């Protein structure tokens, strides 16, 4: 089933795939990584002025990695803001997705966490570095094929 935004994107020749609606009736769209930044700018101009959250997950062992964006259109006098969910999939071998930091600043730490936990590189992010794990950590702890080390270095807090 194609939603209003999906139909609008088709009308304007913007490539995407409709993933239907979630249990709350929020439209979910799949966007290719190479198209994501330009479509993000279009959504911002269209009125999706708030990036509520960004997260990432490992779709399947040896499979794709996904970056998920929850956008909200906040307007004066509107009790129920419009919401939209975007999924961008990247290959496990070279997971690269354009950063939308310059569109929505609220994605800063969220993209960094996705990088730190899953190894998705967000191109043009101004401070893409580990945020939870030490810089010396090897691997991406939330990937399904991650092998946890059998030792941990315990450091004293001072």
Swiss-Prot record:
One of its GO terms (biological process) is photosynthesis, light reaction. Pfam families: Complex1_30kDa (PF00329). It is a peripheral membrane protein. It is an enzyme of class 7 (translocase). SUPFAM superfamilies: Nqo5-like. One of its GO terms (molecular function) is NADH dehydrogenase (ubiquinone) activity. One of its GO terms (cellular component) is chloroplast thylakoid membrane. Its EC number is 7.1.1.-. It is found in: Plastid, Chloroplast thylakoid membrane. PROSITE patterns: COMPLEX1_30K. The keyword NAD applies. Keywords: Chloroplast, Membrane, NAD, NADP, Plastid, Plastoquinone, Quinone, Thylakoid, Translocase, Transport. InterPro entries: NADH_DH_suC (IPR010218), NADH_quin_OxRdtase_su_C/D-like (IPR037232), NADH_UbQ_OxRdtase_30kDa_su (IPR001268), NADH_UbQ_OxRdtase_CS (IPR020396). It catalyses: a plastoquinone + NADH + (n+1) H(+)(in) = a plastoquinol + NAD(+) + n H(+)(out); a plastoquinone + NADPH + (n+1) H(+)(in) = a plastoquinol + NADP(+) + n H(+)(out). Gene3D superfamilies: NADH:ubiquinone oxidoreductase, 30kDa subunit. Belongs to the complex I 30 kDa subunit family. NDH is composed of at least 16 different subunits, 5 of which are encoded in the nucleus. NDH shuttles electrons from NAD(P)H:plastoquinone, via FMN and iron-sulfur (Fe-S) centers, to quinones in the photosynthetic chain and possibly in a chloroplast respiratory chain. The immediate electron acceptor for the enzyme in this species is believed to be plastoquinone. Couples the redox reaction to proton translocation, and thus conserves the redox energy in a proton gradient. This is NAD(P)H-quinone oxidoreductase subunit J, chloroplastic.
């Amino acid at each position: 089933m194609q939603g209003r935004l999906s139909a609008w994107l088709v009308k304007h020749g913007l490539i995407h795939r409709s993933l239907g609606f979630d249990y709350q009736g929020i439209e979910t769209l799949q966007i290719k990584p190479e198209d994501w930044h330009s479509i993000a700018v279009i959504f911002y101009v269209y009125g999706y002025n708030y990036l509520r959250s960004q997260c990432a997950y490992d779709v399947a062992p040896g499979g794709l990695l996904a970056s998920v964006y929850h956008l909200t259109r906040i307007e004066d006098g509107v009790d129920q803001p419009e919401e939209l969910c975007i999924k961008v999939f990247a290959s496990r071998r070279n997971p690269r997705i354009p950063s939308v930091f310059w569109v929505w600043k609220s994605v800063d730490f969220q993209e960094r966490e996705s990088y730190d936990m899953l190894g998705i590189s967000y191109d043009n992010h101004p401070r893409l570095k580990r945020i939870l794990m030490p810089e010396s950590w090897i691997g991406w702890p939330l990937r399904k094929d991650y092998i946890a080390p059998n030792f941990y270095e315990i450091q004293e807090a001072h």
